[in-house]
Amino acid sequence: EIASCLVGSEMCIRDSLKEELFDQVDIDPANIYCPDGSMPKDAILDFCRQYEETIQSVGGIDCMLLGIGNSSNIMFNVGGTTISSRTRMVLLEGASRKEAARTFPSQENVPAGIITMGISTMMNARSVILMAWGEDKASIVAKTVEGKVSDAVPSSYLQNHPNAKVVIDLSAAYDLTRISHPWLVTSCEWDNKLIRRAIVWLCQLTDKPILKLTNKDYSEHGLGELLALYGSAYNVNIKIFNDIQHTIT
């Protein structure tokens, strides 16, 4: 949303940026390029074209700093946005309208449209940093980083960017494989808590009770390290079964 401004609103996003960022740093106002949401609607198309031309005339974008919406929208590029999209006006509907409502007293105050950069504009930046905080972003962060690249999840396009970074806290990272199922991607330091988590996961995956798990189950699902540590599936099964039993009683 760095270069987005709500159309027809006195509470433009650029005003928030001015107060919270631009007024706090040493930056020449002539070097700030924000869409003007107060322009007449019939001027928006030409403005968007000129905005893209301005980006090119100054040598392109060095770095884009982005957030991500709970529905995977980047800026206001929602599901279904094509990779060729550029700066334009979009209508605010559904989830994107709820995202915009955070800027206003209520959802009823949110205007109908917004000017936003497009996916192509973002992908042409030399570097992109995507940030997300909190457990409510965990699911969409996992889809963004590890899911299939799809226009249904616009943020997933960043998988194909040559210099993109995702900066998140542990809560937002919770659904990533290296956090939720680290044994699938790396060697682990196996403590009792991690072993229990892995075995419960394996039981759910194979639809078997703990004591029915076999060496093959462990080997085929990334848990061969536990066989090496404990000698057999039987030994791991008994250990975890007893641990859980003692915890319950």
Task: State what each model feature region is.
Residues 10, 15-248:
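Conserved phosphate- and dinucleotide-binding cores of soluble alpha/beta proteins
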Residues 1-8, 13:
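Single conserved hydrophobic/aromatic residue that forms the stacking wall/gate
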